[in-house]
């Protein structure tokens, strides 16, 4: 299989974590969605990453990829599958994963990546230039209540959606990881969230993400530190 992705697209990071947790064999291929390659648009007319190619069959979208992998590789994890069998438990996993893929993305991870990473590669004509300070301030303000929500969830259960690891944890960690790279997560404001993220960073599936680098923009001091 091949995953078309962007290293700092949080949805792509989620797909990478899901594939790794299910011990699926896959290769990575960088995709610049701004170029709108006709070949890529044939695979995903929405023009967004990630897209998983299973042979010639395209699977588009982070959540769709995760559930596809669960259905095709679930026997690899047995009772430790990341999408529970119980319908109510599955609904809670999907709800929290959706919170990060939708709400957190719009309010935090997308503006941070756009302003601090993507603009570095763009000319002024393409929308590049200095970061929009108001957008960054809003994202940094928003992340605080998201972090408090993570902390509250963890005060009621062992993992974000249940008593064991699920796609909800992978989604939250994927989105928080890009903010963590940029040094924009106030970990000191939630001990529960910090301890949970330390567990996530220590998982073998997370190691490739911690090796990702943005040319000209080094990671925060704690990004690859498992005992931050």
Task: State where each predicted segment sits.
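Short, hydrophobic secondary-structure boundary micro-motifs
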Residues: 78-85, 107-108, 160-163, 188, ...
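GST-like fold's C-terminal all-alpha helical module
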Residues: 100-202
């Amino acid at each position: 299989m091949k995953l078309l992705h962007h290293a700092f697209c949080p949805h792509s990071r989620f797909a990478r974590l899901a594939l790794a947790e299910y011990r699926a064999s896959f290769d990575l291929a960088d995709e610049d969605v701004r170029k709108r390659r006709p070949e890529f648009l044939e695979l995903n007319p929405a023009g967004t990453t990630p897209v998983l190619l299973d042979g010639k069959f395209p699977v588009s979208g982070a959540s769709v990829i995760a559930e596809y992998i669960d259905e095709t590789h679930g026997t690899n994890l047995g009772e430790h599958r990341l999408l529970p069998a119980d319908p109510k438990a599955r609904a809670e996993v999907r709800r929290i994963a959706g919170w990060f893929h939708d709400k957190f993305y719009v309010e935090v991870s997308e503006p941070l990546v756009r302003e601090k990473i993507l603009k570095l590669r763009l000319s002024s004509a393409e929308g590049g230039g200095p970061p929009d300070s108001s957008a960054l301030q809003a994202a940094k303000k928003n992340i605080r209540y998201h972090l408090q929500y993570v902390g509250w969830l963890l005060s009621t259960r062992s993992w974000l959606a249940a008593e064991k690891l699920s796609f909800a944890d992978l989604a939250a960690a994927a989105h928080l990881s890009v903010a963590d790279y940029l040094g924009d997560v106030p970990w000191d404001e939630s001990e529960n969230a910090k301890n949970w993220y330390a567990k996530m960073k220590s998982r073998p599936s997370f190691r490739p993400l911690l090796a990702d680098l943005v040319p000209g923009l080094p990671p925060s001091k704690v990004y690859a530190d498992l005992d931050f």
